């Protein structure tokens, strides 16, 4: 079968991967010369521990298996099973972590509460004051800025994959698509993985879909002269991941409100060390459109302050700052919007902040549902 994937981000690339793995011929079209959306503007986290019970957790766990398998085949994606530590610094945060590890599914998620000395033994770079840490051995990381090109190089070597950038698909045809150069590309099946681009062709074919857009701000430092053996989160991350909900989190929210900047920008701290030693740090969440086009300085000052307090030292100079927009299903409990929009076409979008984590498993399910 000839499969045409519209969209060059990680979700589209994983659909191409799944189709090629099943022996099909794939053409992947991207309107930019390279992916420029959320797929290259994120942490590269494969984040399992904080996922909601049920479909979301199962999808993340399956995706974690697939990422490890892909990492063995394509070392260039930078997969490493480094785990994560959510650093707890107050009694209320410690109560949340204690509540979570006491639940029946804690071991299945890879969660364990560590004492301060155990935290520093696991990740000596965490030199700040702390009461402990929630360790998730299931979490992992990849390199978001190079993962898609590395995957494409592997796919190209199969002889059954073609990459066509700089083309915007303008029309869905009974046997393929037409692009903005006027060229027609034949296909038995079209998979639209267009990310946060929900207008134009997507709106024309699918109408209004139950997906909203979310804007974030992040940054990256110069290389740190120390190795972080895990990804790192602060206690504010408990507020943003469904696995941590419960009476202890209610008490945290009531008695330990976020700082004004963190609350205004709906912030948590996540920190991942890249393979070159630099640190990717974020992030903010903005939900109300039209989004501002400014990159605000206050969130960055907050992130620097929190990161330095966790590390117990000054950060290296900030190398770059950026904003990004991703698509999220309007129902937070729904992993992705997947819909058949024509006899020969599916739309797959809106995984939200779980897109980098879950994309391999989302794609695997799509190709099964589409009969590949």
Please identify what each model-predicted range represents.
Residues 183-273, 289, 293:
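Flavin-dependent oxidoreductases
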Residues 43-122:
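Dinucleotide-binding Rossmann-like beta1-alpha1 core, especially the glycine-rich loop
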Residues 21-40:
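Glycine-rich FAD pyrophosphate-binding loop
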Residues 266-268, 274-280, 286-372:
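C-terminal catalytic lobe of FAD-dependent flavoproteins
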Residues 2-27:
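N-terminal Rossmann-like FAD-binding beta1-loop-alpha1 element of flavoenzymes
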Residues 76-88, 113, 120-158, 284-288, ...:
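Helix-loop-beta segment of a Rossmann-like dinucleotide-binding subdomain
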Residues 162-176:
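A conserved short coil-to-beta-strand element within the FAD-binding core of flavoproteins
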Residues 9-10, 33, 353:
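Residue-level detector of alpha-helix initiation sites
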């Amino acid at each position: 079968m000839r499969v045409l994937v519209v969209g060059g981000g990680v979700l589209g690339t994983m659909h191409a991967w799944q189709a090629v793995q099943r022996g099909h011929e794939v053409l992947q079209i991207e309107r930019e010369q390279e992916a420029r959306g959320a797929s290259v503007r994120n942490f590269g986290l494969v984040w399992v521990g904080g996922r909601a019970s049920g479909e979301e957790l199962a999808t993340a766990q399956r995706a974690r298996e697939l990422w490890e398998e892909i990492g063995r085949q394509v070392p260039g994606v930078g997969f490493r099973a480094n785990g994560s530590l959510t650093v707890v610094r107050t009694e209320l945060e410690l109560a949340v972590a204690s509540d979570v590890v006491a639940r029946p599914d804690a071991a299945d998620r890879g969660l364990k509460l560590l004492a301060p000395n155990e935290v520093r033994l696991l990740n000596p770079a965490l030199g700040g004051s702390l009461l402990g840490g929630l360790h998730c051995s299931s979490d992992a990381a990849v390199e978001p800025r190079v993962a898609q090109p590395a995957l494409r190089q592997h796919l190209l070597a199969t002889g059954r994959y073609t990459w066509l950038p700089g083309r915007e698909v303008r029309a869905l045809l009974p046997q393929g698509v037409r692009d903005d150069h006027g060229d027609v590309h034949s296909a038995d099946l079209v998979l639209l993985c267009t990310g946060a681009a929900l207008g134009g062709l997507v709106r024309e074919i699918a109408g209004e879909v139950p997906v909203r857009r979310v804007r974030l701000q992040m940054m990256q430092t110069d290389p740190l002269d120390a190795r972080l053996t895990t990804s790192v989160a602060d206690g504010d991350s408990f507020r943003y991941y469904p696995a941590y909900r419960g009476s202890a989190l209610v008490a945290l929210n009531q008695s330990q409100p976020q700082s004004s900047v963190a609350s205004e920008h709906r912030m948590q701290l996540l920190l991942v060390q890249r393979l070159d030693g630099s640190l990717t740090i974020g992030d903010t969440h903005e939900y109300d459109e039209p989004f501002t086009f400014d990159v605000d300085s206050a969130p960055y000052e907050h992130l620097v302050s929190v990161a330095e307090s966790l590390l117990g030292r000054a950060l290296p100079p900030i190398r770059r700052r950026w904003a990004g927009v991703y698509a999220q299903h309007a129902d937070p409990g729904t992993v992705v919007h997947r819909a058949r929009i024509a006899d020969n076409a599916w739309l797959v979008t809106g995984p939200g902040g779980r897109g980098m984590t879950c994309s391999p498993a989302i794609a695997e399910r799509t190709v099964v549902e589409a009969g590949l």
